[in-house]
Regions:
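N-terminal beta-loop-helix "entrance" segment that forms/cooperates
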Residues: 62-75
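Amide-donor transfer/coupling interface in amidating biosynthetic enzymes
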Residues: 1-63, 78, 82-84, 88, ...
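Helical hinge/lid and interdomain linker segments adjacent to catalytic or ligand-binding clefts
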Residues: 74, 78-81, 104
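Short, glycine/acidic-enriched capping/hinge loops at junctions between secondary-structure elements
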Residues: 39-42, 68-71, 104-105
C-alpha cells in the first residue's frame, strides 16, 4: 500500500470502501511479465484513476515459476488459477510475456493458459489481452496466426481509430491521432483478422499495424501495444539489450531529439488513462451484473 501511495496512486482503506454504497468491481490480473512488481504498479496506476471502486487480485500459473520476483511477494499477493476457478470477476487483464519467439504450443504453460482463456468466457464480463496475450488469444480463440518481424517493433507510434468505429465507447475522449508504445518481435495481420467475421480491427497504425481488435461486443479486447508502460520502460529495455550486446535500434519517436541522455518525451499517458477508464466504465461496470454470480 505504501509503495502505491509513493507512486501517487489513489488508494482507500476498507472502512471508507465499505461506507460507499457501491459494489467494488473485481478485477483479476494474470501477470506474465518478468518484472511483476513493475507491471503491477503500471496497471494499478491506470485502474485506480477512476471513480469506481476496484478490487484487484493477481493470478499466477502453476506450470511456471517466476525467476525475477521474490517468492515472498508471489506468496503474499498471487494465487494459482486452481484456487480462483470457481470465482467470477467483472474484468480480467492478461499481460504480455517474453515468449514470442516460441510457437504458441511450445510455450511450457500453453495448456494451462488456454484453460484460463476458456474459463474467461464463462467467469469474466470483459477480458483485456495485452501484447503477447493478445496474439495468443487471437490464435487460440479465432485461429489468427502471428508472424515474425524482420526487426523489432520498438518505440512510440502514431495511431488512429479505424474508419467506422469512432462511436465505440472504448474511444471516448480519444484524439484523432494518438500514441502507443510497442515492444515486440511478432505481429498479427489485418488481412487474417478481416477474414474472421467475429473480429473487428477498431484501431491501427500505418507503421505498427493492428492495435485493438474487439470480439463478442467488447467481452474480449485484444491490444497489441503497451499503453500501460511507464515513462522509462522502453529506456530500460533499450539499455538492457545494449548491455547484452544484442542488436537493438533506439526506440522510435521516444527520446527527446532522439537523444537517450535527454530522456523520453511522454505522449501516451492520457491515451492510456482513457483506454483503461473507458474499458472499466463501458465494458465492465456498465455490462456486469450487480450479482457477480450471474456472470455467464
Amino acid at each position: 500500500i505504501n509503495l502505491l501511495k509513493e507512486e501517487n496512486i489513489f488508494v482507500i482503506d476498507n472502512s471508507r470502501a465499505n461506507a460507499q454504497d457501491i459494489r467494488p468491481l473485481k478485477i483479476v490480473v494474470l501477470n506474465l511479465m518478468p518484472l511483476k512488481i513493475t507491471t503491477e504498479t503500471d496497471l494499478i496506476r491506470l485502474l485506480s484513476n477512476s471513480p469506481l471502486q476496484i478490487e484487484v487480485s493477481f493470478m499466477k500459473l502453476k506450470s511456471h515459476t517466476s525467476k525475477n520476483t521474490p517468492i515472498e511477494h508471489m506468496k503474499a499477493f498471487y494465487r494459482d488459477f486452481a484456487s480462483m476457478r470457481e470465482e467470477r470477476f467483472d474484468g480480467m487483464i492478461i499481460t504480455g510475456a517474453p515468449v514470442e519467439h516460441l510457437e504458441f504450443e511450445d510455450v511450457n504453460y500453453w495448456s494451462e493458459i488456454t484453460e484460463i482463456f476458456d474459463w474467461t468466457r464463462t467467469h469474466v464480463t470483459s477480458t483485456m489481452y495485452i501484447c503477447w496475450a493478445a496474439q495468443a488469444g487471437l490464435y487460440y480463440h479465432y485461429g489468427i496466426p502471428k508472424y515474425q518481424l524482420d526487426k523489432k517493433m520498438f518505440g512510440i507510434f502514431e495511431h488512429h481509430v479505424t474508419e467506422g468505429f469512432s462511436h465505440l465507447p472504448i474511444f471516448r475522449g480519444f484524439d484523432d491521432v494518438f500514441y502507443v508504445p510497442h515492444s515486440r518481435h511478432t505481429e498479427v495481420r489485418r488481412e487474417d483478422i478481416d477474414k474472421c467475421k467475429e473480429l473487428q480491427v477498431v484501431s491501427e497504425s500505418d507503421e505498427s499495424g493492428v492495435h485493438i481488435v474487439m470480439a463478442r461486443g467488447g467481452r474480449e479486447i485484444f491490444v497489441t501495444g503497451h499503453s500501460e508502460y511507464s515513462p522509462y520502460t522502453l529506456d530500460g529495455e533499450y539499455r538492457r539489450d545494449l548491455g547484452k550486446g544484442l542488436p537493438i535500434d533506439m526506440p522510435k519517436n521516444y527520446y527527446r531529439n532522439d537523444d537517450p541522455e535527454q530522456g523520453p518525451l511522454v505522449r501516451w499517458r492520457s491515451t492510456a488513462n482513457l483506454l483503461f477508464s473507458n474499458w472499466l466504465n463501458y465494458y465492465v461496470y456498465q455490462e456486469t451484473p450487480y450479482d457477480i454470480n450471474q456472470i455467464r
